[in-house]
Amino acid sequence: MGTVVIVGTQWGDEGKGKITDFLSQGAKVVSRYQGGDNAGHTIHANGEVYKLRLVPSGVLYPHQLSVIGNGVVVNPKSLVGELARLAEQGVTGENLRISDRAHVILPYHIKLDKLQEAAKGADKIGTTNRGIGPAYMDKAARVGIRMADLLDKEIFEERLKANLKAKNEEFVKVYDSTPMNFDDIFEEYYQYGQQLKQYVCDTSIVLNDAIDKSEHVLFEGAQGIMLDIDQGTYPFVTSSNPAGGVTVGAGVGASKIDRVVGVAKAYTSRVGDGPFPTELLDKTGDFIRNAGHEFGTVTGRPRRIGWFDAVVVRHSRRVAGITDLCLNSIDVLTGLDKVKICVAYERDGERVENYPASLKFLSECKPVYEELPGWQEDITKAKTLDDLPENARRYVERITELLGVDLLTFSVGPDRDQTNVLENVWDKVSR
């Protein structure tokens, strides 16, 4: 076999898209397995900038299959638009496959998302208002509409009527809002389904057939483990499982996963509300934000910035079974006189080594930092660790020591040729 899962080890935006694009060069199939179009990533390739939300990055390469698995919630309108934009950049999308079991995001999910978030007031979670949570709620409540339903006009009509009746009652009675029109949604979204019909199939069969043929399959997680609904900073999380969702969300058995690659930035960022122990609210945070262009791909919101938190990434390593590390954006820290790594927390005079479940407990913790000298040299052309200035190399080595995991790649810029490989993950799965 030859299967690799890529997961973010922080709160998303770690550069997973770049690493997925890089590692996908050795893959036959690239698959998403959770999340929705709330998870944007940017890929720089062939002199073009591709901004993807739903489509796996393998779609850029005609010899690869790109799979949207059953664990993904699909906004048909968003997906049709994304494919149209890719077509304008010369990407046909003919190699895309969409699970017939994937659930569909409809306009009432988006409206409900906005109303629920507004009703929370100061307790808002920081959702992207794209209907992800309400779609997963319908899935769990067993009233969701799947891609297979969207393609069947009678079934879609029947289920949409039932769902919209319930949602409109909620809009009017709970939120004092206006109801939505059935005909408008039905006609528009049925047509989206027809446009996507050519891509829809049982993707579990596609993936397992590829694995059984010993083809290299790359699974691409969205968001980050600290946004996992079970393992993240609940309730300030997403509605799916970036950490361990690959087997259920792709329809492959756990025994078929070979390596799990964790992606981290050399610092930490977060979009939206929720705990962030190493957050920087000073000029250092502003420096890193601007140097790293830290603004959301989907929302455009400025990301919150903090020092690298080894407690967070160790937690991610454990719960996701991470075997290898890709460290990105080291170049962003160039120009700082000093850099810090959070190695533990401290609460009431006691050292805390593991990330707590209780947000109250976490709010009482303070980060324990190791301070290292920074570097001023331009590192964007470095190809090996030895090419890095001593202080930058010491910083990278200290992170890997604290995490206890092998470094697979390190990146010193946004372009593919600025990602440097220490060991090829596909060689590891072939051993």
Curated annotation (Swiss-Prot):
Pathway: Purine metabolism; AMP biosynthesis via de novo pathway; AMP from IMP: step 1/2. It catalyses: IMP + L-aspartate + GTP = N(6)-(1,2-dicarboxyethyl)-AMP + GDP + phosphate + 2 H(+). It is an enzyme of class 6 (ligase). Its main location: cytoplasm. Its cofactor is Mg(2+). The keyword Transmembrane does not apply. GO terms for cellular component: cytoplasm. The active site is at 13 (proton acceptor), 41 (proton donor). Pfam families: Adenylsucc_synt. Substrate binds at residues 297-303. GO terms for biological process: 'de novo' AMP biosynthetic process; IMP metabolic process. GO terms for molecular function: adenylosuccinate synthase activity; GTP binding; magnesium ion binding. Binds 1 Mg(2+) ion per subunit. Belongs to the adenylosuccinate synthetase family. Plays an important role in the de novo pathway of purine nucleotide biosynthesis. Catalyzes the first committed step in the biosynthesis of AMP from IMP. Homodimer. This is Adenylosuccinate synthetase.
